[in-house]
Amino acid sequence: MPNMLEIYKCNHCGNMVEVMAGGGAPLVCCGEEMELQVEGTVDAAKEKHVPVIEKTANGFLVKVGAVEHPMTDKHWIQWIELIADGRSYTKFLNPGETPEAEFCIKADKVTAREYCNLHGHWKTEL
């Protein structure tokens, strides 16, 4: 059963959804159940995938990895999301862009998540 803010992906066509309200039925695409994307379960270099959150004067800067993640046509970060106080903020990225996002919000506790097209879903909290 899908829960709020979970990410699901279709293993056939690549469709990805974020659950806005949990329901009682599984998510289906291309005739099969979509796969829940669990953070940090793919065997990959953590130093290039775990988001790094920096508090700034305007809010928060989220960078992907302690070592900058590549942003090539074949390997890139698709999006960065910041969750705070029951709200979700997302920046979508393209190959060639810098894998970071600034979110101008005030909050005491935040969670940053990102999605790598090859190595999946990663998160950290501050």
Curated annotation (Swiss-Prot):
Catalysis: reaction(s): reduced [rubredoxin] + superoxide + 2 H(+) = oxidized [rubredoxin] + H2O2
Entry cofactors: Fe(3+); Cu(2+)
Binding of Fe cation 2, residues: H49, H69, H75, C116, H119
Gene3D superfamilies: Desulphoferrodoxin, N-terminal domain, SOR catalytic domain
Task performed by this protein: Catalyzes the one-electron reduction of superoxide anion radical to hydrogen peroxide at a nonheme ferrous iron center. Plays a fundamental role in case of oxidative stress via its superoxide detoxification activity.
Family indicated by similarity: Belongs to the desulfoferrodoxin family.
Miscellaneous field: Catalysis occurs at center II. Fe(2+) ion of center II is the electron donor and is converted to the Fe(3+) form during the reaction.
Subunit: Homodimer.
Protein name, entry field: Desulfoferrodoxin
Organism: Oleidesulfovibrio alaskensis (strain ATCC BAA-1058 / DSM 17464 / G20) (Desulfovibrio alaskensis)
